[in-house]
């Protein structure tokens, strides 16, 4: 075992096919272990999305493994526990028979997760908690900045070093605004919220960024549901939305951004508001790195350090929209959006409409079903109590993989007035918009 290293250099001196370029398709390191059958005591996967992306959900894996030899014992110097690493990769598969009479096994990729916590619960049992790639973004810092670029370029900067898939139409859109210093997860959330994208990692090893589907892709009948856990909840009525749009322009005046006594060494100084990076100047130290939200300064002699520069000027406008078809006795319940700093004035109206459209879907249906080919963000039609139909988006699936291919599901949508016989296989005939 090799420990305490920062990098490994591989030098290839020869190949078995002279005259051809060497191609390295991947690199696996450490022990490759497969657990299946009785070795997997518990396996729970939580998949969740937010259709508006006002938050990026983190999918999780909770796993308990059995090993008769005690290889996962913390106290075993020759065991596997000693080589486990934070962010260790887990790839999960579920083998399922298509029906009770079938002998053919179908393997479903349940996603890729990265180890966050683990513990020994006995001599033979070990419990693991892992998160998806969005969970990794939550611990990855991002310096932010002021932008006037395309969505594709900004996503590439935020997700540098991460595998992702971005819808081509979204990538070509223009985006402008400001991102503060924060995590890459928060930065990606701001982008997705501004442009109307869904972000999801389920059943994949990549971060997928795409517009939410608008057409129905499946029907969940009562026969696929288990009898326990069915519930329909009416969500609060939202009567309107107020969206603050932001615009940033470089100021012309040089201002004092920072002033304090610093000891010798290299210091990172963060600003309370964005500044033009090229305008930064330092006295009392040497400027070694600069950005919109920060600068790094090296001080050789302890003393006063002053940073000056030109601030960006923020101007805001507020757009207000009211929901349509409100009941006459509706009490005001207005949502406010104030901190979406990538929402420029030209994007405010579309964002407000998306929010009202989503919150017009007031029927939240939770149930347990035999899982199939459905994935998060699918637009589904669900048969509910009394044969009523709810058309909505699949927002959550929670799997118990050791108890069969079962999933606890949440679908949020609206009641359909048409019967099931009108279902065409893709959409309901005569279907109208929500708002």
Which functions belong to the PLM regions below?
Residues 138, 154-180:
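N-terminal export/assembly leaders
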Residues 92, 382-383:
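A generic structural signal for residues embedded in beta-strands
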Residues 87, 376-380:
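Loop/turn positions that initiate beta-strands
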Residues 162-170, 193-208:
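Short, well-structured beta-strand/strand-turn elements
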Residues 208, 394-399, 403, 416-435:
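Viral virion structural and adsorption modules
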Residues 28-47, 51, 138-149, 188-189, ...:
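Surface-exposed, non-catalytic interaction/assembly patches
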Residues 152-156, 185-188:
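Extracytoplasmic/secreted envelope proteins and their assembly/folding machinery
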Residues 1-147, 177-179, 185, 190-196, ...:
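Assembly/oligomerization scaffold segments
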